[in-house]
A protein has these predicted regions:
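Sec/Tat signal peptide C-region and signal peptidase I cleavage site
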Residues: 20-24
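Bacterial N-terminal signal peptides that target proteins for export
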Residues: 1-9
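Catalytic cores of phosphodiester-bond hydrolases, prominently lipid phosphodiesterases
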Residues: 25-371
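Bacterial N-terminal signal peptides
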Residues: 8-19
Length: 371
């Protein structure tokens, strides 16, 4: 979405001496945003479960049969990742499932084309929402999704930093339905890191070591405004492990302050790895979010969930998310998503934009647009 607001903000920052011409640090503007803004000073509308296709008729029938009470909440989907980037989305989410030996999630693909069967039988993390029920994805493996990101980035090297939430899920057995005990272990988390580094390359990444800098801990680096500017971070991706406490403990094992790791994580504020927070429900948590972003942390929240806001036309959650100052506001209903029901609800930032100066952390003035 095109808006004059980023250009106005760039001009304002130039007048304040906060932005200048392109230097060795990078361009003066990135996608119309002032290059000297730090990542934590920008608010973006993102997508939730970004890999998820809109359910096919076959998938709808399967969900209605196996889990009818969940159908309404799963009745959404997104265009391919490249199409989301073309729209202007710069924060996405990819759900990953452990498959170190290969074949764990291959059963639904027994009658698929041979190349697809081969892909699902190969070792490596797969991308899906829930085994046997909600598994249709624009890219079947984590490696394949990363390849899409890298290919798009190579074709658009001046893009804003893109934040990727990597939602690592365990799937314990469910009697009579799912017989496996699929859990992420250290080796699986190491493999995610290896895939990220191999596909994306160091020159396309923002990693914890960069943000920590010379500080003793990652949290200290964050509090000292260690996030890169848009000029320094353009063309790069920031990956965030979205998991559970067991995963977080494993992920920092041998990597204090996430030294040498490719991803950030959702660690508590008092921990040395604290950097990014996930506060899914912004309503009633606005003060907490403002506290965190004012301290230098990144916060992700959601504008809508499980199709509820779209069905009700309820923008209260969106409004709370946007005004809270959370840098990433995820939605299933931005312009360009499949909308077969014709819901009027649409998520965007004020002015209809998908990214803007953050109203709490940026030099934006009262409206969060420009000073």
């Amino acid at each position: 979405m095109v808006s004059a607001l980023p250009r106005l903000l760039a001009a304002a920052l130039l007048s304040l001496g906060l932005a200048g011409p392109a230097t060795a640090q990078g361009p003066a503007t990135v996608e119309g945003m002032p290059g000297q803004l730090r990542l934590d000073q920008v608010q973006m509308l993102g997508s939730h479960n970004s890999y998820k296709r809109y359910p096919s008729a076959e998938e709808e029938a399967r969900i209605r049969t196996l889990a009818p009470e969940h159908w309404d909440g799963l009745d959404y989907g997104h265009p391919p990742l490249e199409a989301q980037f073309a729209i202007g989305i710069r924060q996405i989410e990819i759900d990953v499932a452990p498959d170190p030996q290969g074949g764990l999630y291959a059963t639904p693909y027994q009658l698929a084309a041979s190349e697809m069967r081969k892909t699902m039988m190969a070792p490596g993390a797969k991308v899906l929402h829930f085994p046997q029920i909600d598994y249709e994805s624009h890219c079947l493996t984590f490696h394949a999704c990363l390849t899409v990101l890298r290919r798009w980035s190579d074709g658009h090297p001046e893009h804003l930093p893109v934040t990727v939430l990597v939602n690592a899920s365990d799937f314990p057995p469910i009697a009579g339905f799912w017989l496996h005990d699929a859990k992420f272990e250290v080796a699986d988390l190491d493999a995610l890191d290896a895939d990220i580094r191999a596909v994306m390359g160091a020159d396309h990444l923002i990693v914890p070591d960069m943000v920590r800098g010379a500080h003793a801990t990652l949290a200290e680096g964050v509090r000292a405004h260690g996030w890169p500017t848009l000029a320094a971070g353009h063309g790069r991706f920031l990956f965030v492990l979205d998991a559970n406490d067991r995963h977080y403990a494993l992920y920092r094992q041998g990597h204090p302050s996430l030294r040498g790791r490719a991803m950030f994580g959702y660690y508590a504020e008092q921990e040395s790895e604290a950097s990014v927070f996930n506060i899914q429900e912004p309503r009633g948590h606005e003060a907490e979010i403002r506290h965190l972003v004012s301290a230098g942390f990144l916060v992700r929240t959601r504008a809508d969930a499980d199709t509820r806001e779209a069905r009700a036309g309820d923008v209260s959650r969106l409004d709370a998310a946007v005004s809270s100052g959370a840098q990433f506001v995820s939605s299933d209903y931005y312009d360009g998503v499949p909308n077969p029901h014709g819901f009027a609800y649409r998520a965007s930032l004020p002015g209809g934009v998908l990214h803007r100066c953050d109203p709490v952390t940026g030099p934006c003035g009262q409206q969060g647009h420009h000073r």
